[in-house]
Amino acid sequence: MRRGILLGLMILAVPLQAQSRQSVWDGAYTEEQASRGQSLFQQSCARCHGANLAGTFETPPLMGRFIPYWAGTTMDVLFDYVSTAMPLDRPGSLGPTANAAITAFLLKANGFPAGTKEFASTSEAQKNISFDAVRPIPKKKSAKAR
């Protein structure tokens, strides 16, 4: 009996979790944060990834092919990677605020819109932001809702 109740509660919780999920298309950073991130990127990342984010023979581009690589994940996955593996010559040295700003710049450079709230500098806060390669189609309002 308890298992049935627990299973029922878990099934009911899934739609609630999906409804609370935000997309990068909802504006996961601010313009000002992306601007700070661009400066930090030029100082700490451009020598490997290029000033135009095109990458080199040895490093991947951070535009174009970058999007499908991260698509289907949540933003904490990208943020954790940037925070722990970059810059290559001194991984994890930039700190959470700088890494959040650089991630915001990467989103802007890839055409994702800015919002009114800064991209969080903790992984936990980013677990509900999905990295959708394509803008989700808005749900149509039903005739009754009008």
For the regions a language model picked out, list residue spans one by one.
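Flexible coil segments in periplasmic/lumen-exposed cytochrome c-class electron-transfer proteins
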Residues: 21-22, 91-146
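Conserved beta-strand positions that form and line the central face of beta-propeller blades
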Residues: 27-28, 52, 61
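Positively charged n-region of N-terminal signal peptides that target proteins for export
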Residues: 1-4
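Hydrophobic h-region of N-terminal signal peptides that target proteins for export
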Residues: 9-18
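Extracytoplasmic electron-transfer domains, predominantly the class I c-type cytochrome c fold
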Residues: 56-57, 61-114
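The canonical Cys-X-X-Cys-His
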Residues: 37, 41-52, 102, 106
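Electrostatic cytochrome c docking/interface patches
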Residues: 17-40
